[in-house]
């Protein structure tokens, strides 16, 4: 401390002796000279600061502050790196999920297309079956109508023939026909 105090004191004294204030006023080394008193007070203040090691305390505090800032920076750097790795991981997962979603959508579209085609084929087959059933019903109804018409025509023809035969045939001819029918039936049965 004395090593620093002596050169500082000598510099202050030289600066004080060479100052223009000394040339303008009376003797510099007098307690009546305010410049001298201020200089002495300043030197005493500096000496007290050095005696109580205030510069080293300030330096230590600044060093601690610098270390704290450096540790904060290191922690922030680590957090930033972790955040970047998490971001990269999430981006990879998002790309994977997007790929899976695209694949699911493509599969669903493909399945929907196949289902639509199958439904179309099934609908065409159903229409063909219904058309065939309708045609069968029409043919059956037509056949039934034709049979009904034939049966009525036969019944009308038999009734008309019976009327014609009954009106034109005599009782002897009718008995002769009945006997021939019985004989014919008997021959066919035996």
Curated annotation (Swiss-Prot):
Record localization: Cell inner membrane
CC terms in the record's Gene Ontology section: plasma membrane; proton-transporting ATP synthase complex
Alphabetized Pfam families for the sequence: ATP-synt_B
UniProt entry keywords in alphabetical sequence: ATP synthesis, Cell inner membrane, Cell membrane, CF(0), Hydrogen ion transport, Ion transport, Membrane, Transmembrane, Transmembrane helix, Transport
Domain of life: Bacteria
Topology versus the membrane: Single-pass membrane protein
Membrane-crossing segments per the record: 4-24
CDD domains on file: ATP-synt_Fo_b
InterPro entries cross-referenced by the UniProt entry: ATP_synth_b/b'su_bac/chlpt, ATP_synthase_B_chain
GO molecular function terms noted in the UniProt entry: proton-transporting ATP synthase activity, rotational mechanism; proton-transporting ATPase activity, rotational mechanism
Family, as annotated: Belongs to the ATPase B chain family.
Described purpose of this protein according to its UniProt entry: F(1)F(0) ATP synthase produces ATP from ADP in the presence of a proton or sodium gradient. F-type ATPases consist of two structural domains, F(1) containing the extramembraneous catalytic core and F(0) containing the membrane proton channel, linked together by a central stalk and a peripheral stalk. During catalysis, ATP synthesis in the catalytic domain of F(1) is coupled via a rotary mechanism of the central stalk subunits to proton translocation. Component of the F(0) channel, it forms part of the peripheral stalk, linking F(1) to F(0).
PANTHER family listed in its UniProt record: ATP SYNTHASE SUBUNIT B (PTHR33445:SF1), ATP SYNTHASE SUBUNIT B', CHLOROPLASTIC (PTHR33445)
Subunit structure: F-type ATPases have 2 components, F(1) - the catalytic core - and F(0) - the membrane proton channel. F(1) has five subunits: alpha(3), beta(3), gamma(1), delta(1), epsilon(1). F(0) has three main subunits: a(1), b(2) and c(10-14). The alpha and beta chains form an alternating ring which encloses part of the gamma chain. F(1) is attached to F(0) by a central stalk formed by the gamma and epsilon chains, while a peripheral stalk is formed by the delta and b chains.
The protein, known as: ATP synthase subunit b
């Amino acid at each position: 401390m004395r090593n620093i105090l002596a050169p500082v004191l000598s510099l202050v004294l030289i600066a004080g002796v060479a100052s223009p204030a000394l040339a303008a006023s009376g003797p510099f080394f007098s307690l009546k000279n305010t410049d001298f008193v201020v200089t002495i007070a300043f030197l005493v203040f500096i000496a007290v600061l050095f005696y109580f090691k205030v510069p080293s305390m300030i330096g230590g505090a600044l060093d601690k502050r610098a270390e704290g800032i450096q540790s904060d920076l290191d922690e922030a750097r680590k957090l930033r790196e972790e955040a970047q790795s998490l971001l990269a991981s999430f981006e990879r997962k998002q790309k994977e999920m997007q790929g899976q979603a695209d694949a699911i959508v493509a599969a669903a579209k493909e399945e929907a297309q196949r289902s639509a085609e199958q439904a179309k084929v099934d609908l065409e087959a159903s229409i063909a079956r219904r058309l065939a059933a309708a045609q069968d019903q029409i043919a059956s109804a037509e056949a039934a109508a034709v049979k009904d018409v034939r049966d009525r025509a036969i019944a009308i023809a038999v009734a008309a023939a019976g009327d014609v035969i009954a009106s034109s045939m005599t009782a002897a001819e009718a008995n002769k026909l009945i006997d021939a029918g019985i004989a014919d039936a008997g021959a066919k049965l035996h």
